[in-house]
A protein has these predicted regions:
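C-terminal hydrophobic helical "lid"/dimerization subdomain
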Residues: 1-2, 268-322
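N-terminal glycine-rich beta->alpha transition that marks the start or flank
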Residues: 2-3, 14-16, 23-70
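NAD(P)H dinucleotide-binding glycine-rich loop of Rossmann-like/cofactor-binding domains
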Residues: 48, 88-151
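A glycine-/small-residue-rich N-terminal strand-loop-strand element
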Residues: 70-94
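Mid-domain Rossmann-like dinucleotide-binding core that forms the NAD(H)/NADP(H) cofactor-binding site
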Residues: 84, 125-195
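N-terminal Rossmann-like NAD(P) cofactor-binding module of classical short-chain dehydrogenase/reductase
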Residues: 90, 204-205
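A short acidic, Gly/Pro-enriched loop at the edge of an enzyme's catalytic core
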Residues: 197-203
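Glycine-rich phosphate-binding loop and adjacent beta-alpha segment
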Residues: 214-286
């Protein structure tokens, strides 16, 4: 019998609604792997789910959050080849990752090559896959285009700068002045967060919503694309912002607005998410990507991990480590 520790959202609320339970790690069902987790990402989406503010599908409490994991396969479902045992893997889980053991569909798991650092790989499934989709598939960024990134020092923000640089785009990162040096390490031009008007851009990637979304639309050049992928601003209203995006799209002219949510792609096209993740793992192994880890927090301190991830000064990805 293998015991499991897991973070539980007992009800919606602040960080103190999180607790750590101990139970028996279930044997994996058909088509699934059980992964002994070595690192799990803590995302703004986890915080919004806990607070009852996430705009997408959320399990009813009590549930275990956690969008992404890396770890070692320690058990396999009855129809899964034994060759998976002992393999190091990374996967997008959507929920259930904040635990010592997580259940992962074998079809979603990507194997890690021998030398790859597991903590760096744990930054890929949510932040880097989101960034890849935003740049390649939604905004369809072309080399030489000006791309403006809000929240450039965060986990998705740094991923956007990292991948955008490889695309040959001119990247501009909006961040507090204390984070400008970090933005520059990714080869991007820092933009002061509180400046009155945003620089004009071909593509704007906005995770804040509200007044920020309106400023983003105003900053678009002809033929420009605005992609909203979150509502992190306290004054953002998801229904109002989504309506606004639809209205902007109906205006005459060639500027376009869209909304993107990775969880929708993961449910509709899990094969594509896995293909992108495999490609990112290869690029990480080649030293072309540089994920930034903001903090490593023990699994037994989930409230602290949520506070760190929710802090505007967090730079990069927060990891829970069992």
């Amino acid at each position: 019998v293998t015991s499991r520790r897991r973070v539980v959202v007992t009800r919606t609320g602040g960080p103190d609604v999180l607790r750590v339970d101990t139970d028996e790690a279930p044997e994996p069902a058909a088509g699934r792997l059980r992964v002994r987790v070595t690192a799990a990402g803590v995302a703004r989406a986890d915080i919004l789910m806990r607070a009852g503010r996430y705009p997408g599908r959320v399990p009813t409490p009590p549930f275990t959050p956690g969008w992404d994991v890396t770890g070692v396969v320690d058990a396999v479902g009855p129809d899964v080849p034994d060759r998976w045992l002992g393999r190091r893997v990374v996967a997008l889980t959507l929920t259930g990752g904040h635990a010592s053991h997580a259940s992962v569909p074998v079809a979603d798991a990507v194997e890690l090559p021998g030398t790859l650092q597991e903590h760096a790989a744990a930054c890929l499934p949510l932040a880097y896959v989101t960034a890849h989709e935003l740049l390649h598939h939604v905004a369809r960024v072309r080399p030489g285009e000006r791309v403006l990134v809000h929240g450039a020092a965060g986990s998705v923000g740094t991923a956007l700068l990292d991948i955008g640089r490889l695309l040959g785009a001119d990247m501009y990162g909006i961040a507090a002045s204390r984070d400008h040096a970090l933005v520059e390490t990714y080869g991007a031009e820092p933009v002061e967060r509180d400046r009155a008007a945003l620089p004009r851009a071909d593509v704007v990637l906005d995770m804040a919503g509200g007044a920020t979304l309106r400023a983003s639309w105003r900053s678009l050049l002809p033929g420009g694309r605005l992609v909203s992928y979150g509502f992190l601003s306290p004054e953002a209203s998801p229904p109002r912002d989504l309506l606004r995006l639809r209205l902007w799209n109906a205006l005459p002219g060639d500027r376009r607005a869209a909304f993107y949510r990775l969880s929708a792609t993961a449910r509709r096209r899990p094969d594509r998410v896995r293909a992108v993740l495999r490609d990112l793992v290869t690029q990480l192994g080649e030293g072309r990507l540089h994920p930034r880890i903001a903090a490593r927090v023990p699994l037994d301190q989930p409230a602290r991990a949520h506070r760190v991830a929710d802090d505007p000064t967090a730079r990069g990805k927060v990891l829970l480590v069992p």
